[in-house]
Amino acid sequence: FTYAVQNGDSLISVGAQFGEDVAALAALNELKPSARLKPGQELHVDNRHIVLHVIDDGIVINVPQRMLFYFHSGKLLAGFPVGLGKRTWQTMLGDFEVSEKEKDKTWIVPESIQEEMVAKGKPLKKRVPPGPNNPLGKHWIRISPSCGIHGTNAPTSIYRFQTHGCIRLKPEDIASLFEKVPVGAAVEIVYEPVLLARLPDGKLYLEVHPDIYRKAGDPLAAVNQMAAAAGVESMIDWQKVNEVIKERRGLAQEVGLPVESILKGNR
């Protein structure tokens, strides 16, 4: 789709808004990642993502994909781009549960972050009251003693790895999720940089992300394994697969062979 640039927009802010990597957004529009945007300028945006459906009820967060999905009764109700932990301060993986929801939460600054403030020469803060300077934003969803899903006062940090492990959403997205998700809901945080999907019409899509935490193996081996499990090896354009792996744009890209090629191969 196309997006009309607003005052104050940058490639970073547009990418954060829609869940598209800055490099991919720049390449799609034949721009440099550092390019300045003009109000009214039209940008092509491609934020197609493969939905990782691993539970029927609750929240699924795929770290390399930087996406959060909320399911209820097997149906996808919402999908949002998120900001996650930097490589040196990683977002935890595993099974969690929503234990608390709170609006306008005072941020009690963890000692580890206080130490980081001092090391970087920043003013030391132990508590940050609700308001525009609170990095938690207006909504807080606790999923562990030390981790939560929350808003932000820095919207351009969304769809990037810049947090101390928590999961950030845009203010309007966390407000929507806050109303939908109940206390007790399941939360699964997974690490899947390679995703393969077959749509009802038979088309095959591959989505490959950088291995930001260096936890994954060979992406081509992962695609081979998924394709074999789905029985679609002969339907895949493996040259295209290699291109998608090399680029790692983090977008769902079609990798299926034309029907004629498949039929010819089956003769």
What positions do the PLM features span?
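Primarily a LysM-type cell-wall glycan-binding module
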Residues: 1-19
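Intrinsically disordered, low-complexity Ser/Thr-rich linker and spacer segments
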Residues: 1-3, 44-63, 194-201
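Loop/turn positions that initiate beta-strands
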Residues: 8, 40-43, 184-187
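Short, basic/aromatic beta-hairpin or loop at an interaction surface
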Residues: 15-22, 155-165
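Gly/Pro-biased beta-strand-loop elements
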Residues: 49-157, 176-179, 208-267
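A short beta-strand-loop micro-motif that forms or neighbors metal/cofactor-
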Residues: 180-196
